[in-house]
Every structure is written in structure tokens, then in C-alpha cells.
From Swiss-Prot:
Cell compartments where the protein resides: Golgi apparatus membrane; Endosome membrane
Membrane topology: Multi-pass membrane protein
Key words, A-Z: Endosome, Golgi apparatus, Membrane, Transmembrane, Transmembrane helix
Function per UniProt: Involved in protein trafficking. May be involved in the down-regulation of membrane protein levels.
Family according to the record: Belongs to the OB-RGRP/VPS55 family.
Transmembrane annotation, as ranges: 7-27, 31-51, 68-88, 99-119
Major location category of this protein: Golgi
Hydrolase is among the record's keywords: no
GO BP annotations listed: late endosome to vacuole transport via multivesicular body sorting pathway; negative regulation of growth hormone receptor signaling pathway
Organ and tissue specificity: Widely expressed.
Name of the protein: Leptin receptor gene-related protein
Top-level taxon of the source organism: Eukaryota
């Protein structure tokens, strides 16, 4: 039952993050949909971690594959926060839209992190846990 509650909570927070992202694009005073390109970063961010968990050897304390995955994930997350700032600095979007998109980014990435904390705690990551 705890897995179901966690899944419902993660889905709710993901929906709230996407709502903030869409509000930053679709409100009448903003009306520009360029910030939706951060959706690409949402899709790309968990991929290095999935790959590193498949290829990792559990015998050593330092794992180069996992550290590279953390580095790539950090680059993807920083890029998703940088894109709205660059768009706002070039006057493509307004600063209010930038704030909404960045708040949505924070909520979505905390949701992705929460997914890994709740469902990825075992030795071998498995989709069968939920």
C-alpha cells in the first residue's frame, strides 16, 4: 500500500510541475511556447542513471560509470534551468514566464529524484517493484 501512496504522490507532484510549465507558456500575457523545449530535458535526465545502474559493478566503492552518469545528469538538469534564463535574457519570453518554468523545473526534477529514492532503493533496479 505504501508503494501506491508514493506513486500517487509522485504523479500529483509531476502533474503540478507540468501545470506550472504550461502556465508559463499558455497564459495570455506570455503566450510563447519556446519554454516547452525543457520537456526534452525531462525525458533525457533519468537515462544516464538507468544505464549506469544496468552496467554498474557493485564490488567497488567508486564506480566510474555511475559517476559519469551523475555528471551527465547534472549537465542536463543545469541546462534545463539555463534555457528559460537564456530565453528571458534575450527577451524571447518574459521574466514571469521564466519564473513559472523554473518553478515547474524544480518540481519535476524533485519528482524524478523522488522516484529514484522510492522505487530504486534495491540492489537491482526493477520495474516489478510497483
Amino acid at each position: 500500500m505504501a508503494g501506491i501512496k508514493a506513486l500517487v504522490g509522485l504523479s500529483f507532484s509531476g502533474a503540478m510541475g507540468l501545470t506550472l510549465l504550461l502556465l508559463g507558456c499558455a497564459l495570455e500575457q506570455y503566450g510563447i511556447y519556446w519554454p516547452l523545449f525543457v520537456l526534452i530535458f525531462y525525458v533525457l535526465s533519468p537515462i544516464p542513471t538507468f544505464i549506469s545502474r544496468r552496467l554498474s559493478d557493485g564490488g567497488s566503492s567508486s564506480n566510474a560509470c555511475r559517476e559519469l552518469a551523475y555528471f551527465l545528469t547534472t549537465g542536463i538538469v543545469v541546462s534545463s534551468f539555463g534555457l528559460p534564463i537564456v530565453l528571458a535574457r534575450t527577451a524571447t519570453i518574459q521574466w514571469g514566464a521564466c519564473g513559472l518554468v523554473m518553478t515547474g523545473n524544480a518540481v519535476i526534477f524533485l519528482t524524478i529524484f523522488g522516484f529514484f529514492v522510492v522505487f530504486g532503493g534495491g540492489d537491482e533496479f526493477s520495474w516489478e517493484q510497483w
